[in-house]
Amino acid sequence: MANAERMITRVHSQRERLNETLVSERNEVLALLSRVEAKGKGILQQNQIIAEFEALPEQTRKKLEGGPFFDLLKSTQEAIVLPPWVALAVRPRPGVWEYLRVNLHALVVEELQPAEFLHFKEELVDGVKNGNFTLELDFEPFNASIPRPTLHKYIGNGVDFLNRHLSAKLFHDKESLLPLLKFLRLHSHQGKNLMLSEKIQNLNTLQHTLRKAEEYLAELKSETLYEEFEAKFEEIGLERGWGDNAERVLDMIRLLLDLLEAPDPCTLETFLGRVPMVFNVVILSPHGYFAQDNVLGYPDTGGQVVYILDQVRALEIEMLQRIKQQGLNIKPRILILTRLLPDAVGTTCGERLERVYDSEYCDILRVPFRTEKGIVRKWISRFEVWPYLETYTEDAAVELSKELNGKPDLIIGNYSDGNLVASLLAHKLGVTQCTIAHALEKTKYPDSDIYWKKLDDKYHFSCQFTADIFAMNHTDFIITSTFQEIAGSKETVGQYESHTAFTLPGLYRVVHGIDVFDPKFNIVSPGADMSIYFPYTEEKRRLTKFHSEIEELLYSDVENKEHLCVLKDKKKPILFTMARLDRVKNLSGLVEWYGKNTRLRELANLVVVGGDRRKESKDNEEKAEMKKMYDLIEEYKLNGQFRWISSQMDRVRNGELYRYICDTKGAFVQPALYEAFGLTVVEAMTCGLPTFATCKGGPAEIIVHGKSGFHIDPYHGDQAADTLADFFTKCKEDPSHWDEISKGGLQRIEEKYTWQIYSQRLLTLTGVYGFWKHVSNLDRLEARRYLEMFYALKYRPLAQAVPLAQDD
């Protein structure tokens, strides 16, 4: 109720501000809103609203600038125009939304609740339908018992808030400590108790036993191995799992005694992070071609594959270290669960089980898509996998049980399809679930919710957005690579934030889908594989054996399906980019910027690695981008200054390719219209290559502008090209400028973007959220039932309506 009252007060003050401005600057406000209304029925985005403001006469603008209406205008993310009404979605700060509606004829300002705003917005598509019942999806009532921070600093730092809440609320008296005892007594591995035996039945016995153990251990040398006092511990009711030597066991016992006596957030996190509870991990990534060789650059196969392969190696190292320090002799298992593709010639995608390189306990487990007619053999776009996933989940559960001889301890989903399957598996098996979106498609395709019917035949967004909402509400915790993924920035809406309130007209409206202040959100940034990506200055590690191949790729005069166009001046620095060839990655946009900018063309050559011209693409978007590339080469006469190389699948050689570009004193550019994180940005910076990257999304956080790289706006290509040209001009005048940016990038990576930091954080989060899942289990039952109904009554019919692929 308090939240609702706060929101009404907040909206009311915005309405009053607008009313006051209508009194004091009536003509000026009307001049702007009339321009907006004149655009006719439709949606205006923030940049279009600001453009209308800037088109006003200077005198009119000056009267409004700096006033409350101008602040409201800058915070308005979209305007819905249905003359004579203009509705505004106002976002004063990340995660906080207010809705207003102005009647330009009557000069009436109304405040709207989210459902009212969405209903108004739906009239753009369906017209006025006052009598029709529409399902409203609202998860807010289920969150009443779950703590919610209100401070901006806790967005993406949910575990800190949760630790404070748990230590304050769960441990305020003796009775409230019982969940911790029950949680510790749950832990076992293959029938063998860990930490506590059946002798410990209550809190008094636990505290008494811990004090006895503390006294005993204090007399031992710190390096005394657990085996030497194991029998003594078993006598008093303590089992393995506390540590591998006296020092670690004593430290762990004192942590628990402190928690039982006077809990604090840091002690709680440290203790839960060390509790032995993660031995088997399953990672979901069904779509695309998931393998270790010869797949990068295939449709739907890019950064996510690289991310997961690097992730599992780092997780294995951290798990092995923790298991050893816990005094256990358990072999962990990490399974990457993906789709088996029988016809993926030249790859291992048809093999059921494949060991991950440079690992002992990580495997790729492949399970095929199946229908009543049998196994589906052909590749299927990530937009068309929906009708297969429920059967896939059931088949996967059987295969996992065979491989693990039991249940996993943690299930991690990736992207929309992987997160849906992870949710279904976690629901079925009752285990902790982690969600990683990588990219939420709703933010990539503007207005893809309100106009979903136009796009559904091609993209099936009705399925995907439904799966996303289901998974993000089902999961125990969500990790993102950046703050922007969750809550955007002052100017831009976050990927998750865009799911707070939206509508799919005729299907359902989401009045409260996700709250960016939810403590399940945590920022855990990945790194680059340091064995592949390392600074160009480390001469002894450089893979010079690849240089002749790299020179052939970049500079040979031969034009074929591997490389198109030639570089005439081989002494110029290389402006380099590497990505999938799709609309959002915007490689064709970069080529156009370059083609238009004479100064940049004189200063540097452009090399683009993307798309596979060696074979005919099955992906419609890639085909369209390829045509665009061919047209641009002709339009701007790029041959001589530009090289287009087909996708390169050898990551090791790609690492040396980045370093070779460093040798030319070149730069890397990532021009995406939106990028959730930007793994190639991290890879390039890790090699010491000065990097320019989109300001739309994660790279804006990775790069500190002007120090460790540069931000570019993909929607202002001319400015981006000038920024690139300015850099190369400055480097020509002062070569130390290149070194300065290169070193700044390397320093930034060391501080924040390594897989070691990532894996430590992920396992600690699993401990904390595993405990939270245990203590809040009853409170979450209603939400689970609501999600089950939403899945069965909405998602399943949508998935069944997606056409099945026809094998040739």
Curated annotation (Swiss-Prot):
Q: Which UniProt keywords apply?
A: Glycosyltransferase, Stress response, Transferase
A GO BP term, please?
response to sorbitol
Q: In which tissues is it expressed?
A: Expressed in the phloem of leaves and in roots. Detected in the whole plant but more precisely confined to the vasculature in cotyledons, mature leaves and siliques.
* Record Pfam families: Glycos_transf_1, GT-B_Sucrose_synth, SUS_EPBD, SUS_N
Q: What residue spans carry the region label GT-B glycosyltransferase?
A: 277-754
Q: What do we know about what induces or represses this protein's expression?
A: By cold, drought and anaerobic stress. By sugar or osmoticum. By anoxia in the roots (at protein level). Up-regulated by NUC/IDD8.
| Enzymatic reactions | an NDP-alpha-D-glucose + D-fructose = a ribonucleoside 5'-diphosphate + sucrose + H(+)
| Quaternary context | Homotetramer.
Q: Which family is this protein grouped under?
A: Belongs to the glycosyltransferase 1 family. Plant sucrose synthase subfamily.
Protein name per its UniProtKB record: Sucrose synthase 1
Task: Identify the taxonomic lineage of the organism of origin.
Answer: Eukaryota, Viridiplantae, Streptophyta, Embryophyta, Tracheophyta
Query: Which gene underlies this protein?
Result: SUS1
